[in-house]
């Protein structure tokens, strides 16, 4: 959003089953209202999954992009990397990636080799990209592009802020805990939510009971997912007997302000 004054964006907008699949969504007006950029150009092409070769070829023909930018695990884009030679004749491939831990994933080498620009969201990622490519770095560009949040939207608040206090009272039904852990993501296996819940249980066990009873773990995610696990069962197994109020599920869609609270 906040690069709309530098770039025109066309996004293949994926979802498991996108309700707007097949449409072309023009976001220019909403981006202008959000950023004040009066000539913003942001377009979405909703698809199921992560797209495919046919839609990319059509976008290249219709939109004539100057570059292609990828985000997330490269294995979701094997279809695109299989088109590498076709694409890179005229359009560079750029990849905003993260790999946080060693050993360096040598099995990613073919993906990295298919990119003209590798942007790491941590300095360690940049180093790992270079280690994997080794002597095959060629003339690729490596950049450190750190993750960030819009500080106008996500910021510290005065504990006495009226709306903040009202939200907490409503959210916790007037029984506001002293310590809160907040999880906000999808219920999928790689997020390892049950492991985090077990760690929270260990944390509670390390506290006096009266202190532990004033702590809460808020899970803003699906309770049950085919792509993850049954978190209600995990809660029942780890918490219900000793800490029945320690886990709170949140399913309602939250506004940006509410997420900041």
Task: Name what the model sees in each region.
Residues 155-174:
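A short helix/loop element that forms part of the nucleotide-sugar donor recognition site in Leloir-type
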Residues 188-192, 204, 225-226:
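A short, basic/aromatic alpha-helical/loop segment that forms part
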Residues 15, 124, 148:
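Carbohydrate-associated surface elements
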Residues 1-21, 29, 63:
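N-terminal subdomain of nucleotide-sugar transferases
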Residues 22-117, 123:
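Extended catalytic core of nucleotide-activated donor transferases of GT-like folds
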Residues 173-191, 197-200, 217-218:
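Conserved donor-binding/catalytic core segment of Leloir-type glycosyltransferases
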Residues 96, 121, 183-185, 220-222, ...:
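Short hydrophobic "strand-cap" motifs at the C-terminus of beta-strands
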Residues 43, 85-86, 214, 219-223, ...:
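Nucleotide-activated donor-binding/catalytic signature segment of Leloir-type glycosyltransferases, i.e.
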């Amino acid at each position: 959003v906040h690069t709309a004054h530098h770039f025109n964006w066309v996004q293949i907008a994926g979802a498991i089953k996108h309700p707007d699949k097949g449409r072309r969504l023009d976001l220019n007006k909403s981006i202008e209202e959000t950023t004040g950029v009066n000539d913003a150009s942001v377009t979405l092409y909703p698809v199921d999954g992560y797209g495919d070769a046919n839609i990319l070829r059509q976008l290249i023909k219709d939109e004539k992009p100057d570059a292609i930018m990828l985000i997330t695990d490269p294995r979701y884009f094997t279809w695109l990397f299989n088109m590498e030679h076709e694409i890179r004749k005229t359009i560079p491939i750029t990849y905003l990636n993260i790999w946080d831990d060693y050993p360096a994933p040598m099995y990613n080498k073919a993906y990295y080799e298919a990119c003209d620009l590798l942007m790491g969201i941590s300095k360690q990622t940049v180093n790992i990209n270079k280690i994997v490519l080794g002597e095959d770095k060629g003339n690729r560009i490596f950049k450190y592009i750190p993750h960030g949040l819009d500080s106008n939207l996500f910021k510290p608040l005065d504990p006495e802020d009226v709306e903040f206090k009202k939200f907490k009272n409503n959210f916790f039904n007037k029984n506001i805990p002293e310590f809160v852990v907040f999880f906000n993501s999808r219920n999928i296996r790689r997020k390892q939510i049950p492991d985090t819940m077990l760690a929270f249980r260990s944390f509670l066990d390390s506290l006096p009971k009266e202190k532990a009873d004033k702590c809460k773990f808020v899970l803003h995610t699906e309770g049950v997912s085919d792509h993850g696990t049954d978190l209600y069962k995990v809660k029942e197994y780890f918490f219900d007997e000793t800490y029945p109020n320690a886990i709170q599920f949140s399913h309602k869609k939250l506004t940006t302000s509410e997420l900041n609270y």
